[in-house]
Amino acid sequence: MNKLRSSAITQGVQRSPNRSMLRAVGFNDEDFNKPIVGVANGYSTITPCNMGLNKLALKAEESIKRSGGMPQMFGTITVSDGISMGTEGMKYSLVSREVIADSIETACNAQSMDGVLAIGGCDKNMPGAMIAIARMNIPSIFIYGGTIKPGKLHGEDLTVVSAFEAVGQLTAGKINEERLIQVEKNCIPGAGSCGGMFTANTMSAVIEVLGLSLPHSSTMAAEDLEKELSADKSAEILVSAIEKDIRPLDLMTKKAFENAISVIMAIGGSTNAVLHILAIANTAGIDININDFERIRQKVPVICDLKPSGKYVTVDLHKAGGIPQVMKILLNAGLIHGDCKNIEGKTISEYLQNIPDKPPTNQNVIRDIDDPLYKKGHLAILKGNLASEGSVAKISGVKNPVLTGPAKIFESEEDCLKSILNNDIKAGDVVVIRNEGPVGGPGMREMLAPTSAIVGQGLGEKVALITDGRFSGGTYGLVVGHIAPEAAVGGNIALIKQGDLITVDAVKQLIEVDLSDEELEKRKKDWVKPIQKYKRGILSKYSRIVSTSSLGAVTDL
């Protein structure tokens, strides 16, 4: 083992005061020569996503001790996207990714920790931890809190998105209030992250593919015993990685990120993965840009039938073989790199050796490569005079990927939702929600409430919604987010007017307003930068330093 980083606080006469503090928290003489391992615990009763994390943290803590390390547990925050959705509070969601990253980096570096085991559940926990891990480049592993099991109502599988869609169904007269309350009471049965292939499950899969969590661990149910056993094993593997000096940047290569993007396409993952992978890769110093997603999308089909646009939930994917089964299919098709390594020091080809070449025949969740749901990936990068830096469209399940219609413009999510629920949006409209970008929001809120209301009213195939904000992993339909440059910095989305004709063409990867360059230039001269209403606090600070979404909306470029 190399010299421990923690020797800076444990070794030598001059560190006697430091050791005295450590003795107070349980260190004995023999412990000062052991690696100090941080346990970044995202436990919280704010959200079901994180309420089961403490038992995993305690299990990992025991395993670290048993494996020859000294654990030091500390807390980090979470924000519940599902609870803050549709409110002012959602502006803090993406911001929390940076807070989580900063807090883990701060605690680990301040205490000279030799490694870190991060435990998270809700959406921003995963990328926040990965950004910190990439910054520090100390031996690290991530434990995902696990997915929630599906809610049940009259034999139907429910997720949290079912509740959002029920709101639109109620206002459209498709269901009564009794049904709404039944969905509300049954869609979230216990602990775990939202059950479809939404953002949390997508990002946990990304971490597994990058090699910083154990195979199969990203699709386990939060309440199952195997999740605790996986936490125990993860801690043991981390102590071994410290001894072998296996570091995150040894694993987070360009090929590894390309593998992650390929798997995202294959499983039908969240649009948020684009933003988060760009941010993690930036921190790791890897040249991944928004165009890489389009390049890989053209080659990799969607082979998993998962919610929100599909039929099944993540526990079904786990039973069908999980991410390793998906990876084996892609590996055999030459669509991922088999020489990338994981935290155990094994290559992908090595640890997939015993995974079947074909998906099980007794399931319909994972399809073989020659029988995909969609022949190309579902996350399309659209460009044009409304998004010169790019935008992200999720086109899985969309029967009509091309729409030209009049702009219905809203300056906030709240105004848009009110209009939808008043039945003001008609078939053929292009709904525009602007000033919701990283700077303009600030915080780039997710537009799950408006999109779910549109779907609930039966307009999901007949209306396009575009925004400089984000979408929840639970969103589907003809939606385009992450439009950059955003409205708040003078992007062309700020210049369009009610009724302007907008074309969204996911086939040609095009998003355009029917205006000449001369007209856009004329309007730009009349444009006035919005006044930032937040003068103090984290939203004010964030809006001043955050990058464009096409670079991952990061704060440390």
Curated annotation (Swiss-Prot):
Its cofactor is [2Fe-2S] cluster; Mg(2+). Its EC number is 4.2.1.9. SUPFAM superfamilies: IlvD/EDD N-terminal domain-like (SSF143975), LeuD/IlvD-like (SSF52016). Keywords: 2Fe-2S, Amino-acid biosynthesis, Branched-chain amino acid biosynthesis, Iron, Iron-sulfur, Lyase, Magnesium, Metal-binding. HAMAP family: IlvD. NCBIfam families: ilvD, PRK00911.1. This is Dihydroxy-acid dehydratase. The gene is ilvD.
